[in-house]
Structures are given as structure tokens and as C-alpha cells.
UniProtKB/Swiss-Prot annotation:
This is Hemoglobin subunit alpha-1. GO terms for molecular function: haptoglobin binding; heme binding; iron ion binding; organic acid binding; oxygen binding; oxygen carrier activity; peroxidase activity. One of its GO terms (biological process) is hydrogen peroxide catabolic process. Heterotetramer of two alpha chains and two beta chains. One of its GO terms (cellular component) is hemoglobin complex. Keywords: Heme, Iron, Metal-binding, Oxygen transport, Transport.
Length: 141
């Protein structure tokens, strides 16, 4: 459950992320592909170089979807229902990958934070990203 403090932390941090969604998304995806090379199999048709148009576009899509979740913190499942159906029914992405991407997003946030990421803020973001991953995984049942 996201508390009001969690929601405030998430909105504050996400304001920085959403200022440059393409670049942030590219960095998070690049981290994902480097740390977890098996995730590249879902993007075999992409040019996986960080500067490629495909990675830039997909990185922006990822951030835009998370922005939609941030804008609907009280009903993330409804906000991400279509995206969850797409990944479960059409793309058939292994659900473990949502947690891996969430971790890479959190690392990217920490890397761009001015100074150390405070523990309470990091915890709020982790709770949010976990809730997003659980929302997406729920459509696999």
C-alpha cells in the first residue's frame, strides 16, 4: 500500500524523470540489456544501440507508461490494464522481466539524483515499481 508520503516522494522524483523521458528510458533499457542480457531476446528486431531510434522510442514508451501510473497512484491496475494485457497476451514477456526493469529504473533514478537517494524516497520508489510489476504480472493469470 502506498502511503501519502510514498505518493509525494514518487511524484517529486518522477517530475525529474518525466522532464526527459526519452533519455531516461534509454538509460534504463541500456542498464537492463547490460545487466540482464537475456532480456534482449524480446527486442531481436531492434537496433539495441543506445542512440538508435527504436531504443529511444521504446524508452520513451516505458517512461510514458510509468508516468500514467504516477498520475493514477490510487488505481494503478486500471491505469495499466491495456499495457498489462498487451504484455501478457500478445507479447508474452516473461513476468520476471518487469522486476528486472524496475530495478534498472531505480538504479537510474539513484544515478541521477543530486546527492544520495534518501532511504525513504528509495523505499517509496521501490514500492511503486513493485506495485507496477505486480499489476503487470496479475494479467498472466
Amino acid at each position: 500500500v502506498l502511503t501519502e508520503d510514498d505518493k509525494n516522494h514518487i511524484r517529486a522524483i518522477w517530475g525529474h524523470v518525466d522532464n526527459n523521458p526519452e533519455a531516461f528510458g534509454v538509460e534504463a533499457l541500456t542498464r537492463l540489456f547490460l545487466a540482464y542480457p537475456a532480456t534482449k531476446t524480446y527486442f531481436a528486431h531492434f537496433d539495441l544501440n543506445p542512440g538508435s531510434a527504436q531504443i529511444k522510442a521504446h524508452g520513451k514508451k516505458v517512461v510514458d507508461a510509468l508516468t500514467q501510473a504516477v498520475n493514477n497512484l490510487d488505481d494503478i491496475p486500471d491505469a495499466l490494464a491495456k499495457l498489462a494485457d498487451l504484455h501478457a497476451e500478445k507479447l508474452r514477456v516473461d513476468p520476471v522481466n518487469f522486476g528486472l526493469l524496475g530495478h534498472c529504473i531505480l538504479v537510474t533514478i539513484a544515478a541521477h539524483n543530486h546527492g544520495p537517494l534518501k532511504a525513504d524516497v528509495a523505499l517509496s520508489m521501490d514500492k511503486f515499481l513493485t506495485k507496477v510489476a505486480k499489476t503487470l504480472v496479475a494479467h498472466y493469470r
